[in-house]
Amino acid sequence: MILVEHATVITVDGERRVFADGSVLVDGSRILQVGPSREVHPPREPDRVIDGSRLVVTPGFVDTHVHLSEHLNRGLLLDDIPVDRYLPDWLIPLYAVMTAEDEQHAALLAGIEMIRTGTTTFCEAGTLFDTSAVADAVERLGMRAILGRWTWDLESGPDRMRQTTAEALAANAAMLEDLGARDGLVRGWPLLLGFGTCSEELIRGAKALADRHGVGWGMMHLASHPSRRTRDRLPLATLDAWGVLAPNAKLSHMVYLDDADIARLVRRGVKISHCPTAGLKHTKGLAAHARVPEMVRDGVCVSLGGDSGNGSNHFDMLRMMYLVANIYKDARLDVRVLPPETVVEMATIRGAEALLMEREIGSLEVGKRADLVLFDRDAPEWRPLLNPLNNLVYAATGSSVRSVMIDGRLVLDEGRITTVDERAVYDRVEVLARDQVRRAGLTVLNRWPLRP
């Protein structure tokens, strides 16, 4: 039993309660009590008491769209690579030579970054090959995750990526059986690549597979960039006609939408993963075209995604929240658009809802899983603490995260990762990254030459 007492607690519960002097009592993997400190009474002596008088406590953040494997080559791609050359010239060669060890260490690196910045649950975008090996790495970290394998039915490209429709569906079925048998924090979903790479049969089959296993399914790239409208803007009306739009569907990016599209998302209960950092860097036209405020206004579940090591280049949810809270205010010339309270919901309870976990995570409530983030108030961005939500969204970054609890376990304790040897991961990543680039036949580019 762990008691965090006398903290500023942002619950994101049904009443959106915030306590200036609050406590959270954790018993095993679940929250036993949460409320004003004067009302939280442990039934026995806690195993540990954490003084929260200089802490801010929030629910763990939920990142609904991450490419784990690309963390191994973070920073490799310069920011002036044309969007239509990004995948074929750079990512495909890297993925073609990706080993299980590469994927594991990329996952460890990405996971450490997420933990250190307050993310406790994530959904991989669907770009893994050895999902079992990656699941082992995620379990070592102690994170909650949904994983997906590389899924399309193209018969061109590198040998390991060629898949018929039947092969793609069979591989996903095997993954769901494997991860489902683990009965732990890691689960699997069918997650399709997008980019016009998936047939109707594959999309229908993925949805049927998800329904059969009682999980969600998703498409990685949809309506994401103006230059790809003819390739990846599969009309939502078509997906609807195929019967695949449903509450267990999660679509990513979704920049180019009209009113009819939004109405269809509302009607079908489809979930959206919005990736602000990658969207801006890849010039997707967020400020000019994205309908995020309108989706939120009309009741679409919109969550946040960090995307990739060369897309956003980081997985700091606080930086994503800051962008979302500001981009659309300026775009609409309206300071009332997406207030900090709404953005915090997007990073917590809406993320949980997008991953079909809202009954288990996303808020600090009795009976829910104990996923908590403890921020250190002794940092300049937290002072003075007049409005905790304003400080959280507009001032803080992940650097002030002090401790993180996932499923009742402190995976970050007073600034120290407790589950893996952090330095050993960093050292091995340096070796693997350079070897992967060499095997892919790519060149590391630096506009300012990196001299010996």
What are these regions (language model features)?
Residues M1-G22, V26-L32, S37, P43, ...:
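Active-site microenvironment of metallo-dependent hydrolases
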Residues A7, V24, S29, R54, ...:
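Divalent metal-coordination and catalytic microenvironments
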Residues L72-Q104, R149-A166, P226-N248, R268-K271, ...:
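Active-site gating loops and adjacent loop-to-helix segments of metal-dependent hydrolytic enzymes
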Residues R74-M143, A168-R182, E430-D435, G441:
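Alpha-helical scaffold segments that flank or form the walls of functional sites
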Residues V134-I262:
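Metal-coordinating catalytic core of metallo-dependent amide/deamination hydrolases
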Residues P226-L236, D261-R267, T283-M295, N310-K329:
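Histidine/acidic-residue-rich catalytic or RNA/ligand-binding cores of hydrolases
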Residues A241-N248, P293-W382, A395:
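His/Asp/Glu-enriched, well-ordered alpha-helical/loop segment
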